[in-house]
Design a protein with these regions (language model features):
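Extracellular modular ligand-binding repeats in secreted and cell-surface proteins
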Residues: 1-35
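Short, surface-exposed linear motifs at loops/turns and structural transition points
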Residues: 34-225
Length: 225
């Protein structure tokens, strides 16, 4: 099964174990084009190393604060959630679109990272937005050079129907590997030494992986965690 662990305010982490995943849901889901209000987006292009244990790769996402407050007013706090869908880039290319319903329909594995609160550090990155970090941790060695993509969303539930509003997505801006972000961390003049040590460990573990059509392919590992 899957699990989400909330470790710090506005910092959701997700450890994914996808073997024998059951994709059945208890509610109907409806996908809505990103041009629909409310406005949700990735606060920063790219990704970074998660700076506390367990280390991993993290993205900064957010929703326009005025839109979030209106949704809470209309639907109630328990019926609104902000999150990020994360999946291997090669899976994104297989799906009809990068949405939860498309991945479920294709039986493709993904992580649905839901934040339980907003983070002041991310809020400060974009005026007028409430933001959070979404992290994928405990990535197996065979996936260190594999790109993972992320897309922000906000979802509302009414009468058993869940409606998703997605932010823009592009692989160029939102797909990174832990190898790539580790290289950036090591080169940084401001990153903590503990994070740099983790990043150096990642770089030391990365070996040549099989590449097919430009995609890093899993070695003999069942799922990723």
């Amino acid at each position: 099964g899957d699990s989400a662990t909330f470790t710090e305010t506005g910092k959701a982490t997700y450890t994914a174990v996808f073997k024998d995943e059951d994709f059945d849901t208890q509610t109907v889901t409806v996908e809505t084009p990103m041009k629909s209000s409310p406005e949700v987006k990735m606060i920063k292009n790219g990704a970074s190393v998660r700076t506390s244990e367990p280390y991993g790769i993290r993205w900064a996402a957010g929703i326009r604060t005025a839109d979030w407050n209106k949704l809470i007013e209309v639907y109630g706090e328990n019926n609104v959630k902000a999150g990020v869908i994360v999946a291997p880039l090669d899976y994104v290319k297989q799906a009809d679109e990068f949405t939860i319903s498309a991945f479920n329909a294709a039986s493709l594995q993904y992580a649905d990272i839901v934040s339980d609160s907003f983070n002041a550090e991310v809020n400060a990155m974009a005026e007028g937005y409430s933001g959070f970090y979404a992290s994928l941790v405990n990535i197996q060695a065979g996936n260190l050079n594999r790109k993972f993509a992320a897309r922000a969303y906000v979802a509302v539930e009414k009468d058993g129907v869940v409606t998703y509003y997605y932010g823009e997505y592009s692989a160029e801006n939102q797909a990174r590997s832990i190898y790539e972000v580790s290289k950036s961390a090591v080169a940084s003049s401001t990153e903590k030494e503990t994070v740099k040590e983790f990043a150096k460990g990642v770089l030391n573990k990365v070996i040549d992986v099989t590449v097919e059509n430009g995609n890093a392919v899993l070695t003999e590992i069942a799922g990723y965690a």
